[in-house]
Amino acid sequence: MSDVSPPSSLRVFPDTGALLSMLIFPRDRLGNPTLAGEVLDLYQQGAFALIISRAVVDELEEVIDRDFVAYRSQVIGLLAPRANQFTRWPTPEEIAATLPFTTAPEDAPIFAATVVAQSDIVLSNDFRAFHTPQAKLFWAGHQIALESLYGLLCVLGRRQRKPATDPSP
């Protein structure tokens, strides 16, 4: 991860899972870029600004310590040069305001941090928490677009959205 700020004004806020995928799983077993790797490559090319919250980093460190201990020094090494650029933790009031829109209270700090960061896009593949109808109301109410890794690649012109299928017989 480069610590050079890209010229783009598009502010993309990755949730913990998206950031984890970008840092630990940018390539598959054959060395080909994963969706997360393609997003990381576009960031490194300056296609968007990556906005990282202290709340996401704290949660990421917990996940690394629990599930990916072997990657701890690598992840810390990639994030440390950017530590002074992390956005602040949301206040208890900011977190509480998100609770009606979250399916799990532990996601509330990340929802609030996205707003604090003044993000254009929240990047998440967590469809159980970030892509629910109530979460989509939250994002829309704060004028924040919600995209998956694939969706962000569509926004950036690297993929095409699949047409919606007609469920009628």
Feature roles, as predicted:
Residues 121, 127-169:
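Acidic, PIN/NYN-like endoribonuclease modules and their adjacent C-terminal/linker elements
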